[in-house]
Amino acid sequence: IRTKRNRVHAEINALKKQGKDIKQVLKDAKKLPGELKKVEEKRIALANEIGEILLTIPNMMHKSVPKGKDDTENVVREKIGKPKKFSFDVKSHGELAEELDIVDFDASAAVAGNGFYYLKGDLVLLNQALQQYGLNFMIQKGYIPVEPPLMINKRATQGVVDFETFRDMIYKIEEEDLYLIATSEHPLISMFVDKILEENQLPIKFVGISPCFRKEVGSHGLDERGLYRTHQFNKIEMIVICKPEESYDYYDELLGLSKELFKSLGLPSRVYESCSGDLGDLKAKGADLEAWSPRKKDYFEVCSCSNLTEAQSRRLNIRVRKGGEKYYPHTLNNTAIATSRAMVAILENFQNKDGSVDIPKVLQPFMGKKKIEKR
């Protein structure tokens, strides 16, 4: 239609020069803008539809991912540290925290509903100590600290997650194209949307610190009054943007740093690799670090490490220039420490018979004490 429009304009000019009648040609020309608008609207609609379909295509898994139907077939790869044997009946973290008067779940439920909490006294200090220790730990390992925005738009959100699957987990701001972040990974990766990086800028290694917000809630029962699965929590998150041939080396590095961090806290843990049936659509490979719960006599997730290869960089149009060519970099993410879950592990693993809780040695300088006791 644009070609026809150009041709008609040329024809009108030619007819004018020849002194001929241009009424019919003008009549035809006036129809063209409307026709062009209709076709352009159809083109945009089809492009959007194609884009939505492309977003549903999953990533290719790495050949080393164990095969399995769901999380019951995930594989234990390694255990770090031995669980402590207690000479008394251990309490859940929620019981301990309430008895020590360092948390108030009833007050938070009254003002915000279930899945929130008021931290008090030494638990506030422990929460802050974990964030500062985790941040310092990763800075010393070469990661640059970043404090990101706590809200991002739909384009950014779609670029980092399977939006249709993730939609029910995230909070949307009414009448705004903004969503509260579920992890700082999302704004850290989308920070580079539509950008072309030079290869000598790689690797990009960030450690983000932020509150996080999710709609997910915990299971019913005693541990629902707790810190394990909540709507709001603080997290130290790591991301890497790197050359494709280096991404699995960084995957090992990220997972290794989480193991080292939790070992330094004195918490028994294990590496639990996701099988094919439990791996998210965008992940090529992933594993959780799980801490030991003496109350449940089982491990629970505290960290998650993933290699998403090109999935996010393609969706966000992040490219790297090498000479005269461009390619999509690989992206990875890893939980350095989600403080609420780390506090669950510390309260349960370091509890004493008298109801007090020992503070891990590496955190004592941040808290100025060795033990949490009832005031």
Regions found by a protein language model. Give the residues of each.
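TRNA-recognition modules of translation machinery and tRNA-sensing kinases, especially anticodon-binding
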Residues: 79-375
